[in-house]
């Protein structure tokens, strides 16, 4: 809690906070996908040294306005940012969660962190779908919610099967 207060005070005092949204929107030229990718980079950087709740709060203060301005729904934006604040612990370059797991298993930390990243790839795609489909967040008509859930499930299954090398002989 103390670190977020200090970091927020430093960002607000320097004027970087309000400008960060402007900088992200200028780089992305208002494109939702580019804005979201820049937010993923920010989430990864913040997740390297901060606990997940603090990283999410920083993203919510400074990256969420840019994503919402680019056209994403508010609920989808915050779920997207929270998801990537969590995922930053299992993806390289730091992959703190994977490194700890490798230490417990007495395995190679780099191969464990790469495996963690590869196995979480379907989740990265689903997180981007939160920004484009409110149906995945149970918003909208029931038929669209069911169709979105089915197509997302099939997509995640297909990616997971492809990553694992299953279903090759179909």
What are these regions (language model features)?
Residues 1-16, 32, 36-45, 49:
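Core transmembrane alpha-helical segments of multi-pass membrane transporters/permeases
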Residues 11-27, 134-144:
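Membrane-interface helix termini and inter-helical loops of multi-pass transporters
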Residues 4-7, 13, 17, 60, ...:
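Alpha-helical transmembrane segments of polytopic integral membrane proteins
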Residues 33-41, 58-62, 76-79, 149-158:
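Hydrophobic alpha-helical segments embedded in the membrane of multi-pass proteins
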Residues 83-169:
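Juxtamembrane and boundary regions of transmembrane helices in multi-pass small-molecule transporters
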Residues 32-46, 71-87, 111-122, 136:
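Alpha-helical transmembrane segments of multi-pass membrane proteins
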Residues 52-85, 94-111:
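Hydrophobic transmembrane alpha-helices that form the pore/transport pathway of multi-pass ion
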């Amino acid at each position: 809690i103390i670190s977020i207060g200090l970091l927020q005070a430093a960002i607000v005092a320097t004027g970087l906070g309000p400008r960060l949204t402007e900088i992200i929107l200028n780089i992305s030229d208002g494109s939702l996908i580019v804005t979201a990718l820049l937010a993923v980079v920010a989430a990864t950087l913040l997740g390297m040294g901060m606990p997940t709740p603090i990283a999410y709060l920083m993203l919510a203060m400074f990256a969420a306005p840019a994503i919402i301005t680019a056209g994403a729904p508010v609920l989808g934006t915050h779920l997207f940012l929270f998801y990537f604040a969590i995922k930053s612990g299992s993806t390289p370059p730091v992959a703190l969660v994977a490194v700890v797991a490798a230490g417990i298993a007495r395995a190679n930390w780099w191969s464990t962190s790469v495996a963690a990243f590869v196995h979480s790839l379907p989740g990265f795609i689903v997180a981007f779908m939160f920004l484009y489909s409110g149906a995945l967040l149970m918003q909208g008509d029931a038929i669209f919610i069911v169709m979105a859930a089915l197509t997302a499930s099939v997509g995640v299954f297909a990616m997971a099967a492809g990553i694992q090398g299953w279903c090759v002989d179909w």
